């Protein structure tokens, strides 16, 4: 339910962009994101930091896109957010005792320390890769292709990365947790 709720603003953005253009799509994205955050707060009692970062970025860059009727600002949102996620993971990897991934999931899953470091580094590289691909597509291909990529390409890449992560984690789970 929670993951589905996170994709509703993106799907609405895609549909409104295709039907009415960037200004209406940006406004729709902002409103849908704010509603999504309110629902998450009411249903789960809190808004996670990642959701707060994404929501703030949507409101900021989406407002600029709506005001100037220009998609470029939302293109930069994706680049900035993925760069920020990658940087945060890298800083946690090398600057703190535990990588961020371990801090987030370590209570639910018991894994060797080096596995946590590999996962953290893997996701940092993934976000960096998403940032670079987004940067290329946003600058060298059409706006329509970028919207398609943002809606379906990044979603597909994220699902694949999540699946690979799950398979990787499974190999290192204690036998009792594998069942």
Curated annotation (Swiss-Prot):
GO terms for cellular component: plasma membrane. Pfam families: IspA (PF04279). It comes from the Bacteria. The keyword Magnesium does not apply. The keyword Transcription regulation does not apply. It is a multi-pass membrane protein. The chain crosses the membrane at residues 11-31, 52-69, 71-91, 121-141, 149-169. Coiled coil: none annotated. Plays a role in cell envelope biogenesis, maintenance of cell envelope integrity and membrane homeostasis. Belongs to the YciB family. This is Inner membrane-spanning protein YciB. It comes from Histophilus somni (strain 2336). The gene is yciB.
